[in-house]
Amino acid sequence: MLNFVLRELTKKEILSLYKRFLTKFFAGNDESFLISEAAIKWLIARNLCRCYGLYDDKKHLLCFGLFINDVERRVMLLDYFIVLKKYRGYNYPEIFFEMLTEMSVDEAEKNDNESILLGIFIELAGIGDMSAKALDKRQRELEFYRKLGAYITDIIPEFSDEEYNVLFMPINARLTRLELKAEFLNIYKEILPSFKDKKKYIRRLTEEVDGLI
């Protein structure tokens, strides 16, 4: 039975992964989804970026997740999640998020609930005019995150022409609708210097209680 290790990566390791894997993964038509190396360095310098890697017992990197966080590190936004090509088709993503949850809960208990991770935001592409293939992929992603406890909120970012739905995966707290919006905005107001009018960027998607659909 394999023993897995999940750990937070250093600045040097993050930049190495960016060059070795992210640039290749998004090469071609998806390049617009990849932020620049300068942006990664900017986020790291301001402590607004964290990256975790899942390793097997032979220290092979299986997958990694790059997250953007607010200054207080109360919430994180999943920016990129990559499973290395030769390790795809296994349950490593589930193991990654389960171990990340366990790690965050343990840290909260040790810190007496001070500076704890409340949960993780996940942006999922809106349906729009998706092809049948893309729609099927989106549905599988949605089902994956739902199995981990995530749910669709009533937040829709309008930072570009692309529409996104925002999911929230509770870790140490289940937030109200107002708290969700406040925490989501806390992330973006740090990474968008011109972020001033929240109404310009956030609009209501549904009137369902607590953002559940």
Language-model features, listed with the residues they occupy:
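Conserved acetyl-CoA-binding loop-helix of GNAT-fold acetyltransferases
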Residues: 83, 89-108
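Conserved beta-strand in the GNAT
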Residues: 53, 59-69, 75-82
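Residue-level detector of beta-propeller blades
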Residues: 8, 60-61, 151-152
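A short helix-loop-beta-strand connector motif used in the catalytic cores of GNAT acetyltransferases and
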Residues: 41-53, 63
